[in-house]
Amino acid sequence: MRLTDIEIEQALDNGSIVIEPRPSNDAISGVSVDVRLGGQFRVFKDHTAPFIDLSGPSTEVQAALDRVMSEIIEIPDGEAFFLHPGELALAVTYESVTLPADIVGWLDGRSSLARLGLMVHVTAHRIDPGWQGKIVLEFYNSGKLPLALRPRMTIGALNFERLSGPVARPYNKRKNAKYKDQQDAVASRISQD
């Protein structure tokens, strides 16, 4: 069952869900908590690589990713990152989230942003039980105009679902967890599969 606003506030109060900085009660509605955009981004650089062979040897996949992904781009508060039509960018939430082993989170984009062509997560919207860290956002502009994204703007909402019991392998305990404790706009680590 999805947690209600009352249950979300109780989980924040008792520390079973931790969101830092803690959201105001105005950011909690019905079944969700608003999250804001952080100031870190990554984009695909201009490159001459014709493709990335995702099934190739892991060293070759990683080398290709290193060639095409930018370093972290820091956008100060008050300034904007421009996402042009047809572009993909990675970013992070301003908030850091910690979930217990018996709660899964779900990230939803905002309808108002989707109506302008902004996809906030291309596919990955589940936040695993045991997650700890910032949430990477996979932006795609499917619209016709560049979109100005500013740090700390409301970018999406998290909702939470209590499981029938704690999972045996929470994310923060898995040895092969590729994005454990992430604080940055981490590029794909598919080469570690």
Swiss-Prot record:
Pfam families registered for this protein in UniProt: DCD
Complex and partners: Homotrimer.
Protein name: dCTP deaminase
The keyword Oxidoreductase belongs to this UniProt entry's keyword annotation: no
HAMAP family per the UniProt record, alphabetical: dCTP_deaminase
Its job: Catalyzes the deamination of dCTP to dUTP.
GO molecular function: dCTP deaminase activity; nucleotide binding
Keyword tags: Hydrolase, Nucleotide metabolism, Nucleotide-binding
Intrachain S-S bonds: none
Catalytic activity: dCTP + H2O + H(+) = dUTP + NH4(+)
Protein's gene: dcd
Binding site for dCTP: 110-115, 128, 136-138, 171, 178, 182
Enzyme class: hydrolase
UniProt xrefs under CDD domains: trimeric_dUTPase (cd07557)
Record GO biological process: dUMP biosynthetic process; dUTP biosynthetic process; nucleobase-containing small molecule interconversion
Listed InterPro entries: dCTP_deaminase, dUTPase-like_sf, dUTPase_trimeric
Region annotation Disordered: where it falls in the sequence: 173-193
NCBIfam families: dCTP_deam
EC annotation from Swiss-Prot or TrEMBL: 3.5.4.13
